[in-house]
């Protein structure tokens, strides 16, 4: 599929309309921006009324003052079916959100990093069943914290060395935070995010206990950052160079990386959260994800535009190929999008509480049941951003759905699951 033809920019033959919104009250500052919307009815497979409902739903989040801005993109059979940008990327300077707005991907970076590792698997340089200690010996002889306190932890040896597959499925036993207080305190003392490199990160991680025995429990974690360190070690290249050579350059992703060039920083979106009075205030980036770049964090550090990320997502939808380049084989994409948690009890089988419709593949969530709390299809694959970003690839429907908002909830869980559910329901109900 010729991606350069699929992702024509606003103002191209798709005939984008620009709606200038004036006279809005101060409380709706974000909605003063122009909205751009594509002619969705030109692409088969969507109904125009459904797309209008999608736009109305996105506008409601901005007009109510909950969000500064949103940008969404739907691809069907490799064509842009709908693109909609509304509100601001920068409230203070009244700069509008658009398809060329650069956003922090946060955990959407994990899918990209997983693909990079899988290219090495295909070359025979890695195997999913390999113990990670084969490549990072400082992570050998893991201990699991089963009780005690941060100062006097009760430990027992892990039953087996965790594997690359367990890294990709967040079942290696690592954490991010929010786990039992004692082990979270132990981890916080390591100041992992002060590391200046992935090798330093692994060295800081090495003495920390696991929270679960490997392979027994899904626990969202730093696993993909460890995976990135493996990729660096095996490839002999800096992680960002691996991504650039194996993914970004073949796909034409010119606005994606772990930093933002000075000449492009005027396109960078600010991230917002509700302030004490409920009005939006600028939020500090998580783990030092700043445009100057503080390191290549495989699990959360990438910047990108929605068009750039659509090139990546469309590659997955097209079974690993794009622009005449094969990034992954079809069967590897099949494996990536298959539920890998089938051996675990159901309560350990999902990322979101009380959600039994989704399992987890390699690097991302996969829909395994038609039920659940939102519309979708069995086989949907994708992930989310802490800044309430959304990516789903549906190969059966030949559909890619993306939305970036750069919004934190201001709570311990920065991702707004309510928005995720609303967006998923609205774009799915627009399908014919």
Regions found by a protein language model. Give the residues of each.
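Structured C-terminal helix/loop/strand segments within mature extracytoplasmic catalytic/sensor domains
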Residues: 382-432
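Signal peptide processing junction and immediate N-terminal pro/mature segment
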Residues: 20-34
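Acidic/histidine-rich, surface-exposed loop or edge segments in extracytoplasmic proteins
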Residues: 33-42
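Short, conserved catalytic-motif segment at the N-terminal edge
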Residues: 42-105, 125-127, 141-148, 285, ...
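Positively charged n-region of N-terminal signal peptides that target proteins for export
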Residues: 1-4
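Short, surface-exposed loop or secondary-structure junction motifs
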Residues: 90, 142-378
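Active-site SXXK
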Residues: 52-59, 78, 102-132, 140, ...
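Bacterial N-terminal signal peptides
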Residues: 10-23
């Amino acid at each position: 599929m010729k991606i350069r033809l699929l992702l024509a920019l606003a103002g191209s033959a798709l005939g984008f309309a620009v709606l200038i919104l004036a006279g809005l009250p101060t409380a709706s500052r974000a909605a003063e921006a122009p909205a751009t919307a594509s002619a969705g009815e030109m692409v088969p497979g969507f109904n125009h009324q459904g797309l209008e409902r999608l736009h109305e739903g996105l506008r409601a989040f901005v007009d109510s003052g909950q969000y500064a801005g949103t940008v969404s993109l739907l691809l069907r059979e490799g064509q842009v079916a709908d693109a909609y940008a509304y509100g601001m990327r920068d409230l203070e300077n009244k700069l509008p959100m658009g398809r060329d707005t650069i956003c922090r991907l946060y955990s959407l970076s994990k899918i990209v990093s997983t693909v990079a590792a899988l290219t090495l698997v295909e070359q025979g340089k890695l195997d999913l069943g390999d113990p990670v200690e084969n490549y990072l010996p400082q992570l050998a002889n893991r201990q699991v914290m089963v009780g005690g306190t941060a100062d006097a932890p009760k430990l027992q040896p892990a039953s087996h060395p965790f594997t690359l597959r367990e890294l990709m499925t967040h079942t290696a036993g690592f954490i991010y935070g929010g786990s039992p207080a004692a082990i979270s305190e132990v981890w916080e003392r390591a100041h992992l995010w002060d590391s200046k490199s992935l090798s330093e990160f692994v060295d800081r991680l090495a003495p920390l206990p696991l929270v679960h025995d490997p392979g027994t429990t899904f626990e969202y974690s730093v696993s993909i950052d460890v995976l990135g360190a493996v990729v660096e070690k095996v490839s002999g290249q800096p992680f960002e160079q691996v991504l650039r050579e194996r993914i970004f350059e073949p796909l034409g992703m010119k606005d994606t990386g772990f930093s933002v060039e000075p000449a492009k920083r005027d396109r960078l979106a600010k991230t917002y959260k509700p302030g004490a009075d409920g009005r939006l205030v600028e939020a500090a980036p998580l783990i030092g994800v700043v445009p100057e770049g503080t390191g290549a964090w495989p699990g959360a550090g990438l910047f990108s535009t929605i068009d750039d990320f659509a090139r990546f997502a469309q590659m997955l939808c097209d079974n690993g190929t794009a622009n005449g380049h094969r990034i992954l084989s079809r069967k590897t994409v099949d494996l990536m999008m298959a539920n890998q948690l089938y051996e675990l009890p159901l309560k350990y089988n999902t990322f979101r509480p009380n959600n039994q419709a989704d399992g987890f593949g390699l690097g991302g969530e996969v829909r395994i049941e038609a039920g659940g709390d939102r519309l979708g299809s069995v086989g949907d694959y994708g992930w989310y951003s802490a800044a309430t970003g959304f990516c789903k690839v549906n190969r059966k429907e030949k559909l890619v759905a993306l939305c970036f908002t750069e919004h934190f909830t201001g709570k311990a869980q920065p991702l707004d699951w309510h928005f995720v559910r609303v967006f998923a329901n609205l774009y799915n109900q627009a399908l014919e």
